[in-house]
Design a protein with these regions (language model features):
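Amphipathic alpha-helical segments used for helix-helix packing
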Residues: 96-116
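N-terminal intrinsically disordered/low-complexity leader segments
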Residues: 1-7, 197
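Amphipathic alpha-helical packing segments from all-alpha helical-bundle domains
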Residues: 67, 71-74, 97, 115-142, ...
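Helix-turn-helix
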Residues: 11, 19-53, 57
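Amphipathic, non-transmembrane alpha-helical scaffold segments
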Residues: 9, 55, 59, 63, ...
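Generic hydrophobic, amphipathic alpha-helix propensity
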Residues: 8-17, 33, 58-62, 66, ...
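Hydrophobic alpha-helical connector segments
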Residues: 57, 71-97, 151-158
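Hydrophobic/aromatic-rich alpha-helical bundle segments in the mid-to-C-terminal region
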Residues: 103-104, 140-187
């Protein structure tokens, strides 16, 4: 495959992400995607067999940095709390730099109902939560944070906080970046969990 084929395919995926961000998952049709890409629907089929194939690639794009982020955080020689913060900051940075992709977090339910994306998005959600749970459990085991709440509860809370910030930003204008706002709230929240030594 030539470079132009790959780059055009990537532009189509980027346009699909933009359509989802601007108008929701239901607006992602071959017609809308072809219009946005200024191409015919027939030409679109040269790159993808249909919208479901595009959606699979969108989900792949959404989760493509997950493994690298986990490996980088695990390799750090730092406290468990710092690992949690670095993990969350990596996603906050990603969502700041590619804001349209963050809206996929608000589409989880719908993506779970589409047969072609169900397995991949379920895997992505589960892997992120399991990794966060482990980070929180390690922080509890080392006495860095309180064990008043379960690691699973904390992982779900911090994920819910991200979803809430993403949703709120779609409704209201914010002067601060997503990363600034989210990480500021995470720091305050983590301060409540920390055990002073």
């Amino acid at each position: 495959m030539g470079d132009s084929f790959v780059s055009r395919k990537y532009r189509i995926i980027s346009s699909a992400v933009e359509i989802i961000s601007e108008s929701g998952l239901s607006a992602l049709t071959t017609k809308n995607l072809a219009l946005k890409e200024n191409m015919s629907e027939t030409l679109l089929y040269k790159y993808f067999g249909g919208i479901d194939e595009v959606l699979v690639e969108v989900v792949e794009t959404y989760s493509k940095f997950d493994k690298g982020i986990r490996q980088t955080v695990q390799a750090k020689e730092t406290s468990n709390v710092e690992k949690i913060m670095e993990y969350l900051e990596a996603y906050a940075t990603y969502y700041d730099n590619y804001y349209a992709i963050s809206t996929l977090m608000l589409q989880y339910e719908e993506l779970l109902h589409i047969m072609e994306t169900r397995e991949k998005i379920a895997w992505c959600i589960t892997e992120r939560l399991v990794f966060l749970e482990q980070l929180f459990q390690n922080a509890m085991d080392s006495g860095e944070i309180s064990d008043l709440f379960s690691a699973s509860f904390l992982a779900n809370n911090v994920t819910g906080m991200a979803m809430s910030h993403i949703l709120e930003r779609r409704i209201f204008y914010h002067k601060k970046s997503f990363k600034e706002e989210y990480m500021d709230n995470v720091r305050k929240w983590m301060g409540l969990l920390r055990i002073e030594k």
